Amino acid sequence: MQEHYQPAAIEPAAQKKWDDARIFNVSEDASKPKYYCLSMFPYPSGKLHMGHVRNYTIGDVLSRFKLLNGFNVMQPMGWDAFGMPAENAAMKNNVAPAAWTYDNIEYMKTQLKSLGFAIDWARETATCKPEYYRWEQWLFTKLFEKGIVYRKNGTVNWDPVDQTVLANEQVIDGRGWRSGALIEKREIPMYYFKITDYAEELLNDLDKLEHWPEQVKTMQRNWIGKSRGMTVRFAVSDDSKQGLEGDYAKLLQVYTTRPDTLMGATYVAVAAEHPLAAAAAADKPELQAFIAECKAGSVAEADMATMEKKGVPTGRYVVNPLNGDKLEVWIANYVLWGYGDGAVMAVPAHDERDFEFAAKYNLPKKQVIAVGDNAFDANRWQEWYADKENGVLVNSGDLDGLDFQTAFDAVAAKLQSQGAGEPKTQYRLRDWGISRQRYWGCPIPIVHCEQCGDVPVPADQLPVVLPENVVPDGMGSPLAKMPEFYETACPCCGGAAKRETDTMDTFMESSWYFFRYMSPKFSDGMVDPAAAKYWGAVDQYIGGIEHAILHLLYARFFTKLMRDEGLVNVDEPFERLLTQGMVVCETYYRENDKGGKDWINPADVELTFDDKGRPISAVLKADGLPVVISGTEKMSKSKNNGVDPQELINAYGADTARLFMMFAAPPEQSLEWSDSGVEGAHRFLRRLWRTVYEYLKQGEAVKAFAGSQDGLSKELKDLRHKLHATTAKVSDDYGRRQQFNTAIAAVMELLNQYDKTDTGGEQGRAVAQEVLETAVRLLWPIVPHICETLWSELNGAKLWEAGWPTVDEAALVKSEIEVMVQVNGKLRGKITVAADASKADLEAAALATEGAVKFMEGKPAKKIIVVPGRLVNIVV
């Protein structure tokens, strides 16, 4: 065995051994319990970042732990390869997105392999490959035929200069990120998935997810947003019907969760796209201008919540069905046409948003809820104004004095009797628009025919292949400029037709990839039925909490769609979810001449610390001049505080990177980058290596201790007790608790005790062998390369075949224990007694200790408190 730890030599050798034995390549095996462990697959951006390393190391630890415990472990990997960054990089570098993507995949795959992850690379999948998205297109056509996918107009951000649709994040202060042009809202035909048909099941099935973080489930419940309320129909005033047709000339319909406050409504607000707004604006330029302004604004609901609320009166009125009051209709920028009825009733006295709007435009506020003796002040919002739990109605005629639920029922009865409303359950969740006016995505498999309408592409003509030799110029959709792509024959009538040139939202690919991994080369369907039956749901899913809503919700939705198509036999995709924290690092900057900040990489900064090790000043190494310490933030390119994993691997080895990531913080918490922490991790691995080296230097490896320990010294018995207590703790930390930092700490403590124990002689050497073999197996999930090598030196066999160490219950039983002795609650000594010593024996032994005699000062004991197995407290 070589004397010094050399990761650059041992890590490739260990990886070759695993690859040659194909131990991570799995198939369905009914003789073993299955364990499907999956970390969210990466976008092939070019290089791994530390967040990737943490994410995939967590998954690898769990996978290797289960492998040693006899499970048939599948840990696949692939690439979420479609998306906007590839198009942006293509335009910047004048290269096709496909070429850029495939180059990145190759480099990142090399990086992942260098970290030694137990990945079944035979299952590798890239979502931009036709053999993958073919089945996505196939499912789309099936759902289109069933009506679960449908087409309707949707609102998008339109850049009039680049002639293209922009995502919300590409709109900066109302302008296009590339052209700088003022963005317009446009209505264009788009395809939608009826996720709302599954809203109730998506909500209810959250209760089945016992091993998901409660925070994630709460976020999904809020996103689905089930509410019980009422549809209320306000009659359009006779003097306000001009320009309106059909039902819109008769009624304005709104949904409210607070029908009890209907008597407090003082105006109604509608979206800019509402027919009533259009009718009112027909001869009013000021209304037309405001509507145009609204349409130029953001289409993101999140922006609606934070932007300044604006509105204009239409001069049109509707009638409150409860009291006959005429309420003016306002056009407001905070009302979304695509949500509900595109109209809301406003009760300024009891809704904070309406209160602010009414204050801005001097609209009346009518109190109809009272809470105790609290005084209503129309000039100042107070939280109790919206209290429906403790409030009762006032100023509401015969409804006065009613609580929320009673008033709800009474208003419902009145409105229903008039045909002016009815109770309704509504969801905040809206149908999922999947059309994207971009190139680098999965083509939508629809043909538009003037004779036959929208025709799904038949299964035998799939996939509709995306041309890969295209370099986008940012001016509209490239596919819409390629007759060779869009010109086709109608599958129904054979006449000239045009392919859909929109592509699918990239969330589509990530909504089912975990099923494709089960049979990635299966050519007769989305997933092989036998594989789907065996692997079932993902047992452990790992990823950032930023994916708590959209990705995880869409993945749950797709699972139910695929179940209903008979493709899988599970209701939920992920049994257990772990949301790892971010990797954060210090940030530093200097202010530049333009008033901005130039961010400086931590590697280029030299720090000065106070006597407690806290940084108090920083200078740039290059010039010795000060830089500002800006605090810790998530590693990012924008703050220039990232650390390249490849540099870390090159300097210290993959095991050091893995160990630091698992030891620095519990997995669900943020991990703060620390150079000293990395060095500490490397020191521990050198120490582990040295410990085994010194043991083998004294003689050849022996058979690990097993059997009765009656003949062992107390010191060796104590070491075996520590060993098996550590094994039990680490097993629980990996399996139930998923707290890897405490598992590592436990093994460190074990090695500390090993170093202090005399392991000479035949029995001592057998116990030493047992300790070292066990420590190596306990650490293999986290630092597999060094452990694989040390196991080979200690045992000569294959570690992955050795199995997880078992706990010797006999070793956990101590014949003697150490008990603290206190006098008046203060520690005055310790005694070693038989583990089964009686209360009287403990009292007698404690009273006889030197410390007790000294501090009792000859006084008699008033009381002796015995805590079995822990302490004796003598009270004098």
UniProtKB/Swiss-Prot annotation:
Source organism, top-level taxon: Bacteria
Annotated residues for binding of ATP: 637
Record keyword ATP-binding present: yes
Subcellular location field: Cytoplasm
Enzyme Commission code: 6.1.1.4
Xref: CDD domains: Anticodon_Ia_Leu_BEm, LeuRS_core
Catalytic activity: tRNA(Leu) + L-leucine + ATP = L-leucyl-tRNA(Leu) + AMP + diphosphate
GO molecular function: aminoacyl-tRNA deacylase activity; ATP binding; leucine-tRNA ligase activity
GO biological process: leucyl-tRNA aminoacylation
NCBIfam families attached to this UniProt entry: leuS_bact
Protein name: Leucine--tRNA ligase
Organism: Neisseria meningitidis serogroup C / serotype 2a (strain ATCC 700532 / DSM 15464 / FAM18)
Lineage start: Bacteria, Pseudomonadati, Pseudomonadota, Betaproteobacteria, Neisseriales
